[in-house]
Amino acid sequence: MKIQVLGTGCAKCKELTKRTEEAITLLGLDVTVEKVTDLNEIMRFGVVMTPALAVDGTVKIAGHLPRVAEIQSVLTTALA
């Protein structure tokens, strides 16, 4: 599983990274979070509002800061 946080480094983007790492730990997953900060690369995902979370190359959350539980749900669904 490839997990990417898309954002330019703003406070919300950093918080999404932190919450995503927490969700990964709570789920006991052995994956790392890649930070995508290049605006051109973010735009290739079709994201117009950050922060965003992509799993295996597909944007699952964009434009808001989700709670840890929402991130866990997204990751669990992606594993199924």
What residue spans do the PLM features occupy?
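Local sequence-structure signature of Cys/Sec-based thiol-disulfide redox active-site neighborhoods
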Residues: 1-19
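Terminal leader/tail segments of proteins
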Residues: 2-3, 32-34, 73-80
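Conserved functional loop/turn residues at catalytic and ligand-binding sites
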Residues: 9, 46, 57
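Conserved strand-to-helix beginnings and helix N-cap segments that scaffold or border functional pockets
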Residues: 14-17, 47, 65
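Residue-level recognition of oxygen-bearing side chains
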Residues: 15, 38-41, 70
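Conserved helix-turn-beta segment immediately C-terminal to the redox Cys motif
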Residues: 19-32
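Thiol-based oxidoreductase modules, predominantly thioredoxin-like and allied folds used
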Residues: 29-41
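C-terminal structural segments of small proteins and small subunits
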Residues: 50-80
